[in-house]
C-alpha cells in the first residue's frame, strides 16, 4: 500500500472558556491543532449598554489585542460571538442588549482578525434581526454554526412536551433563513456541526450544495473501540470524507482542554482523511464560472485547442465510431477497391483527422479525407501536419466555413465535434444543416444525434459568483442585471444540490431529413422538490450518439468515464426561488433562431411565475 | 340639478368581422363611437407558414395600410390579433403556426399604429409562450382582453362535464401569469370585459389594482327596461363608474354593427358616467411617484411652502388644538394676567404662527410666540410678516436650528409640523427630542403623539414606474438596483390593491420622558392575503394626535376629511412576490438611527424570505 498523501488538514480546537490565551494556543499546537476557537468576550466582564455609554465600558469587555501579533490573531484564533444573546427577542430590552453586544463584539473581532473568521452559532430560524446585525458590511468570513440535526428533534423522540414548530425543526431552514435575509452574501458560510444522529442521505446532499467552510466535531460523537481508542462510527467517517472531498473544509473540534485524547482526535481526523484521499483530476476547476465558447464566431486559440486535445477519451471514441462506420460501409470484399470519403468539418489542429486515419488503418479501409476549417490560425497547423506527418495520406485541406464549402464529391462520413456542454449550444445543428448537403444519400454523420438535459439545482456559490460580477460605483448598492443573471455559464459544479433528476430537453438528429428544417425548439419540463430548498437555476448536460452504440455523455447518470472536455452548463434565475418540499417546478426552455444568432430563453411557471430570461438573447446571444 | 360636466369618454366599436374599413369607421362615428376595434387579419386570407416562406405570402394576409392615413390608423382603429391560434399548444405545428401568425400580425399592427393600441384576447393561464411572443420589444400598448368572470365557471354551474383546473378558473390568474412572464412590462395593460356575472367585491378591488386601460362591454349584458330601452343593471352601472373614476379608462362595445341600438349604447355609457361624475381634487397626482421631502436637510422652496399652506384643513386643526390647549392651561380667571409661551419650531412662512395668533384671539388668551426657523429664505418671509402684519403682536423670531436654539424662557406649548407621510420620516422625533428641553415640566407638545401604519399592497403601476427609473446603456437590459427598488416614495395611490388592512408600526410620544431616548425601532407585522395576488411593497400612513381628541390622519380608515398635505408612503420590494390566498405575510420593519442619519430597513420572512432592503440606508438615508 502506498503512503497516504500529505494533504493539508486544518483543525481548530474549540474552547468553551479561556483563561490564558497564549498558553491555550501553545497547548493546542502541542496537541496538533492549528488554531483555537475562543469566545470573544471575556466572561468576567458583564456588559450593560442601556445604562452606560459604550465609550467608558469599551475597554473592559475582553482582552487586549496586544496579547498576540496580527498574524497570530489571524491564523491561530477563531473568534466566537456570544450566543447567550437574542437579537430577535420580542422583548425590546433583550433585543437591544443583543444588538449592542454583537455589534461591539463584531467590531472588535474585525479589529483583531480583519478578513479572518468569526464564528456565530445559530439557534433558530427566527433570525432576521440577527442576520441584519451580524452581516452588514462584513469584511471577513462569518462562519454560521448550525447543527446537522436539531437537538430538539432528538429530544422529541423521548419527550412529548417539547415544543417546536413543524419545519422549523429542520436546521437547514435556520441557515436558509439567515443567508436569505443576508441576501446570499458570499462572506457568510456554514460551520456544520456533525451530530450523533445523522440525517437522511438527501438532507446530507442538500448540505453539500451549501457553502460549508468548516465541519464541527464534538468529542462526544467519538466512540470508544475495543482497544480503548476514540473512533468515529463508519457513517461519521464517511461524512467526514465526503465533506472534505467536496469542500476541502477545515475542522473545529469541541473538547474539554483537559481531555486526554485531544491529540488523538486531531490525528484521527487527519488519518481518516488521508487514508480515504482520492485526487480529483478536475481539482482547481471546482465551481469556477466560465463563459461558454463560441468556436463558430470566435477563432479558438492554441491554448484552448491544446486543452481539448488532451481529453483522454473523446478522440478514442470518435476513432472507434469512424472505424465501425468504415467497416459497416465497406465490406471486406471491397477494401481494396472502395475508398470512403470522410469529411472532417471543423478540423481544428487535426485530432479528428488523426482519429480518422487511425480508424482507416485499424479497419484496413481506404479513405480520402477532406478537412474543412475556418480558423486561419488552425489552418497553419493543419497544413504543416499534412505536408510533414501525413504527406503520404490522401488528405485535402479546405480553408473555409463548412456552411459555404463546395466539395468536388459527396461524403460517406461527415465527422464533426461542434458539441457544447448543452449539446447544440455551439450551433452544431446550424453547421451540420449547412454541411449535410455534401453527404451521400446513405452517408452518416458522426455524431448522428445529440440530446440536451436539464435539472433544477441549488447552487448558492455559483449564484453569488454571478451576482458579484455586477459592477457598481457604490459598493453597497445591490445590483442585478440581465447582463449577468441571464447569461449562461459553464462550470465544474461540485458545490451544488440537484433538486431533481435531469430530463431531456432538445434533440437534434444528423443528417436532418425534415422537409423544412427548423432548429428552434420549445420544451416544458416538470420537476419535483423532495426537500425544502432554494432554486438558483438549472444545470445543463448533453449526450451524443457518435455512431450506433458509441456515445459520449456528460449526463450525470451516464457520464462517459474519463471524459474531460465538458463541464456542466448553468442557467441562472434572476432571483433565487424558495421551494418547499413537494412543490412542483415547471420550467419552459426555448431555443430561438434568428438570421444571425441563436439563443436560449427560459422561465419558470411553478412554483411561482418568473419573467422570461435572456429575452432576444439580450444577455447571451450565440452568433452564427 | 346642475348639468353633467362634459367629461371625455372614448368608446370603440368592436367588430367581429369587417368588410369595408372606411365605411365601418364612418358608420361607427355616426353612432357616436370614436374608433373601431377590428381583426387585423382578413378572414379571406388563410396563412400557412410552414410550407411557404413569409416573403411571398406577406402582402396577402390583410388589407393595405394605404386605406387610411397614419393618424386615422392611430386614432380610429384598434387592431385585434387573431385569437384562433394557440402559441402554447403541445402540438409543435399548432404552436409554430400560432407564433408565426402573431409575429406577422404584431409586426404589421406596429407598422400601422406605431405606439397605438393592439388588442389580444387571453383564453387561459397557460400563456408563457404567448406572453413571450407578443410582448418582446413592444412599442405600443398591448391591451390584454380578459373576462372578469371565466365563462367556464358560469357554465360549471349547470354542467358537470366542464373540465377546468381549480384556481385556473380565476381569470385574474390568467392575466397575472401573462404579465408576470412579461416581467410587468409597462406596455402591457388590461382590457377588462364586464361579464353578466359580477365577481365578489374583493375581486373587483383586486382588478382596481391592475393597469386597466379599457373596459369591454358586450351588448348582451344590457337589459331591456320597461320602456324598451337598453340599460345596465344597477351593479353594472356602479362598476362602470368605479372603473372610470379609478382609471379614466376607455370603453370597447361589442355589438353587431346592424344592432339598432348602437347609438344608444354609446350615449348610455356617457350618460351614466357623466351623471355620476365627481371631480377628484387630487386628480393629476394619481400614482405619481415623489421622493419624500427632507425639510430638515434641504431648505424647502417657496413653491413647496405654498402647496402645503393651501391645505384647507390642517391649519384649522392646529389652530383648534392650540386654542384648546390655551384654554386648558389658562383658566378664565387668569386670562388678563397670564401669558402663555408658545414656541413654533419650524415656522416656515408662518402658517403655524397664524394658527397660534387665531387660537389666542379666539380663546382670548395672551400669548408670546417664539418662532424658530432654520431656513434663511423662510426667515425673509417671517420677518416681513412680523414687521408688517403682526407688528402689534408679541412675536420673537429666532433664526436657528431648533435643536440648537437657546431660548430665554421655557414654553407652555411647543408647536411643530415635522410630520411626513410615515409620521416620523421627516425626523420629528429627533427634532422634538432636541427642542423639548425648552418645554415647561407641564408643557405640551402639539402634536403629542404620532403613529405610523403599514399594509402590504399590489401596485404594478407604481412598481413599473420605479423599475423604469433604472438607467441602462442598452435599453433591452433588465436592471434592478437597490438605488431605486429600495428607496421610499410618496404617491397618491389610486391604482392599487390593498392586500390587508393597515397595522400600527412605530409610535412616538412628545415630549419623550424616557430616561434614555432611543428612537430606533423594530416591529414585526403579520398580514394575511384573502386572494391570490402579487405583493409589490407596502403602503405607509400615519396619524397624529395634535391635542386631546384633535387628530390628523391619513390612515385610510380614519383619514381626516379634506386633508391634502400628505399622500401615502410606498416601500417597494425588489421583486414582486406572488402570494396565494390564505398565505400569511410577515414583514419586519426597522427604524435605524446613526450619528448623522436615520433610515428604514425592511424585509419579509413569509410567505418567503426576502433580503433586507435599504441596508444601512444605502438607497435612502434621511439626513439629520
What is each stretch, according to the model?
Chain A
Residues 324:
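Pre-Walker A adenine-sensing motif
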Residues 348-349:
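Conserved SAM/SAH-binding loop
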Residues 1-314, 320, 328-341, 345, ...:
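Class I SAM-binding transferase module
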